[in-house]
């Protein structure tokens, strides 16, 4: 059995304040923990410098979390100061280090940030933040969030605001916090050992330093290496000014030039989609298949689901206003709405119209005529995404692929029926390989190398480093073909692969509709299709698959389901005939990524137990509580940026400050969780903005696990949220408007100020 550490690895972290700098380091086996302080009260500079010299002399490796972006550049500056002193007395102050740290942080605000080249690092760095791709915006994850997902006993946030001059007692607290962070980083290091060893093996095998590459980058670099071996200079040109990336940039793309010639659709819906694609000339790839006006849909408008959009005119529109509107929306129309408010009626000259009456004395009385005010709206239809509806099943098209699904439905393979899921094997790579599609500047040789990597991967056992790197290489090319910083960049390649992938799956559906009576399409996704058929038609299904595979030169892989519990295309449970379970989206509680929110996992577990096993939600949750180790499944977490503050407001209005990253659980006690954000610019007089992160339930903070108690839990929260995940129930409106804590936390992470009060 492998050790839970690698020799010569040391875990470290630094903290910087104007009055104190701390450096904590521990060997990867957990031994030899050391702390060094340079502050207004003491200086461990000599011992600290000796530690760094030991690392350099003995070729040790330092492991951190975002250390390439912060910790090491600060250490590098300190080491440069010591080197430049050439043995002469050189007293380094905490304030100097603090300024270095702030400059390092500022460098990321104004650009890509200042980092030290790998070859210039005096001590080899391993950055867990980089390895796990947490520097990607979609996966951005802090060490504190990892502490939650690692189920750490204590989650500690930075105890003092940045820039504060700390007292001696606060310095002691900072040292304890620094140690805590190092031990949590050590914990995550052990979770990351497989990834680290994988990178070490690849680096040794291929002569490329993969140490801090994320998985996607490993795949891309491996493929670039293979291309350059075969065609030197094809990815990068070397000029007197340095290395220049080779790409194919296009002013526009004629989609008809991207389409393959093997489509023989019979369904008018798919014929219309193919023709729509063929008519498009695009100059960018993002958003080109969304928010499409009815007038621009062509025949697709006969089969698409559209929404009505409205734009209010300012006052009564003139003919010029209407003409301008109709020019933008040729099939649009104007609607007039009468309001409750009244206004004076005007004649054709814009003068008030009067109602004249004669009273009993013969006196004439004039009164302005009042009529209801009117508002005028320009209305038009548009497709939020390119789509067609085939026999009640909606197929959506996009740059990311096709998708469609039944919603809020249980589909079962009753006696005499089959549910079959067919996925295309390595779809995007094989579209390129089989149809000889390649980024123009890489030449057709690209396809030969792509095919060789694909075939080579199959020769290595699953789980091997070789198999893994080749899988990463196969999958990384497509996404990078639309990355303007990549040597794979050719947006026409991107569009050729994705559009033909979608049309190919449409052809699969078309063939099934023609050959298999009463076939029910359950789901359609980027690389596959799930259907329900009568068992008697299995031979017909097999014939369709064989015909389709021959036509499009792709291979299918199959799975058989006993039942599917579908909330929507992204959230469902599939029960295989062998008893295994596939979970997606809100139902997933196993195999979650480190960047994903792992709050209140008892909720999807309880919903699954009721749907698959017939165990009521209440019974499952009550039984789950009987095991003390299950307490983690009841905990949630939230985070707010340093510019905001998090408080718990008690019934009497008392505000209890909480740390910005907070673990908690719904409780009959405690208070409401509220986030206070800074006032908007120009509206400072209105004060802070308050956002209720959860106002339907009280909560109790639980950053220290010792504060948790099953006796204080509000079980109604867990019961209610699990019920919202039940499929095939009557409360579909509530289900689709699922605003539970877990989902709202995810929304809050994606957009900090998504709601205000």
Task: Give residue ranges: language-model regions.
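Gly/Thr-rich phosphate-binding beta-strand-loop-beta motif of the actin/hexokinase/Hsp70
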Residues: 3-27, 426-428
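Active-site cores of enzymes that catalyze phosphoryl transfer or operate on phosphate-rich substrates
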Residues: 11-22, 454-494
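RNase H-like nuclease fold core
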Residues: 17-39, 142-145, 149
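Conserved DEDDh/DEDDy metal-dependent 3′-5′ exonuclease domain
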Residues: 33-145
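Short active-site loop/helix that positions an aromatic residue
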Residues: 69-81, 425-439
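Conserved catalytic palm subdomain of right-hand nucleotidyl-transferase polymerases, strongest
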Residues: 125-127, 302, 410-428, 454-461, ...
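Conserved "right-hand" nucleotidyltransferase catalytic core of DNA-directed polymerases
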Residues: 149-157, 164-425, 508-549, 554-555, ...
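C-terminal, non-catalytic extensions of nucleic-acid polymerases
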Residues: 249, 297, 301-304, 313-320, ...
